A protein has these predicted regions:
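Juxtamembrane helix-loop-helix junctions in multi-pass membrane proteins
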Residues: 15-46, 92, 165-189, 203, ...
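Cytoplasmic-side transmembrane-helix entry/capping segments in multi-pass membrane proteins
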Residues: 64-72, 119-131, 153, 177-186
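Transmembrane alpha-helical segments that form core, pore/gating elements
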Residues: 48, 107-109, 113, 144-202, ...
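Hydrophobic transmembrane alpha-helices of multi-pass small-molecule transport proteins
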Residues: 48, 110, 119-141, 194, ...
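C-terminal transmembrane-helix exit sites in multi-pass transporters
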Residues: 49-56, 103-128, 252-273
Length: 289
C-alpha cells in the first residue's frame, strides 16, 4: 500500500507539472502574461490561506526570516512565473517544459557556487552532458523557429536560474517553515503586485478573455498551485529524494505529448534525439549525489 501511495503521488505530480505548461500557453492566448500570472496567484492564495487556517499554520515566517519572505514573494513567485508564461508566448510548451526539466542540474550548479557543496566526477559528467544537450536543443529549435524565439528562451532560462538560486538560499538558511507558510502570503502579495502591474502596463481587455484562458488560469492557481504543491510535498515526505526527482524526467514527456495531440506541434527530430542525453545527464546529476 505504501508503494502504491508513492506511485499515485508520483503520477499526480507528473501529470500536474506536465499539464501546467500547456495551461500557461492557453492562458496567454487571450490574457497578457503578467496579468494572467497575477490571476493565477489570486486564485491560489485564498485556498492556501484557508488551508493554513484549518491547520493552524502560521502565515508569517519566523522572526529573523521575514525579510526573506519578501524575497520569496518577488524572486520565487512574481518574477520567475511571469517570465515562464511570457516565454511561452514565443516558444512551445513542450520546449519550455524541457528547459525546466533541467532544474536539478541548475540547482546543482547553484549549490556549487552558493553553498560550496562538494561534487563528484559522475555529477560533473552529468552536468556537461545535460548542459550540452540542452544547448543543442535550444540552438536547433531557434534555427527552425526564428523571430522572437530567443526572447522566450532567455525568459525561461532566466526563470530557471532565479528559481535555482532561491532554492539554494532556502537551503542555506535552513528554512524550516511549512510548505503552506512558504507559499500562502508570498503567493497572495505576488498576485496583488502582478495584477496591479499587469493592469497598468499591459492594459488587458477583459472582453477578449476566452473561457479557455480563464479556466486555464484557474487550473494553474487551484490545481497546479495548491493541489500540485501539496502532492509534491507529500511525495517528498514518503519517497526518497532520488525517486521524487525523477518527476523532472517524466513531466516533459507529458507536456510534449499533449502539445502534439492538441496543437499538432512537436519539436524537431534532432531535438527529440538530444532529449535522450539530456535525460541521461540529469539522471547522473541526481543519482550520484
Amino acid at each position: 500500500m505504501y508503494r502504491v501511495t508513492i506511485l499515485v503521488l508520483f503520477l499526480l505530480v507528473a501529470l500536474t507539472w506536465g499539464t501546467t505548461w500547456l495551461a500557461m500557453r492557453i492562458a496567454a492566448e487571450t490574457i497578457p502574461p503578467m496579468f494572467a500570472t497575477g490571476m493565477r496567484f489570486m486564485f491560489a492564495a485564498p485556498c492556501l490561506i484557508f488551508i493554513a487556517w484549518l491547520r493552524k499554520t502560521p502565515l508569517l515566517f519566523p522572526p529573523g526570516q521575514r525579510l526573506f519572505q519578501v524575497v520569496i514573494c518577488v524572486f520565487y513567485f512574481s518574477i520567475p512565473f511571469s517570465l515562464m508564461i511570457y516565454g511561452e508566448t514565443y516558444v512551445s510548451s513542450g520546449l519550455a517544459s524541457i528547459i525546466f526539466a533541467s532544474m536539478p542540474v541548475a540547482i546543482l550548479i547553484a549549490s556549487l557556487f552558493f553553498l560550496n557543496e562538494k561534487t563528484n566526477l559522475m555529477q560533473i559528467t552529468g552536468l556537461i552532458i545535460s548542459i550540452s544537450s540542452l544547448a543543442g536543443i535550444l540552438l536547433e529549435e531557434m534555427k527552425i523557429n526564428t523571430g522572437g524565439h530567443w526572447q522566450g528562451v532567455i525568459a525561461l532560462v532566466s526563470a530557471l536560474i532565479i528559481h535555482a538560486i532561491i532554492y539554494t538560499q532556502c537551503k542555506k538558511r535552513s528554512s524550516t517553515v511549512s510548505v503552506i507558510t512558504f507559499n500562502a502570503l508570498p503567493c497572495f502579495f505576488a498576485g496583488l503586485i502582478l495584477s496591479a502591474a499587469g493592469w497598468y502596463f499591459e492594459r488587458p481587455q477583459i472582453s477578449v478573455f476566452s473561457a479557455q484562458s480563464i479556466f486555464s488560469t484557474l487550473y494553474l492557481g487551484v490545481f497546479a498551485g495548491v493541489f500540485g504543491i501539496l502532492c509534491y510535498f507529500a511525495l517528498q515526505q514518503r519517497a526518497s529524494a532520488f525517486q521524487a526527482s525523477l518527476v523532472f524526467l517524466v513531466f516533459p514527456l507529458i507536456a510534449v505529448s499533449l502539445e502534439k495531440y492538441i496543437y499538432g506541434y512537436a519539436i524537431s527530430t534532432h531535438s527529440i534525439l538530444l532529449v535522450i542525453p539530456l535525460v541521461i545527464g540529469i539522471f547522473l546529476s541526481i543519482f550520484f549525489k
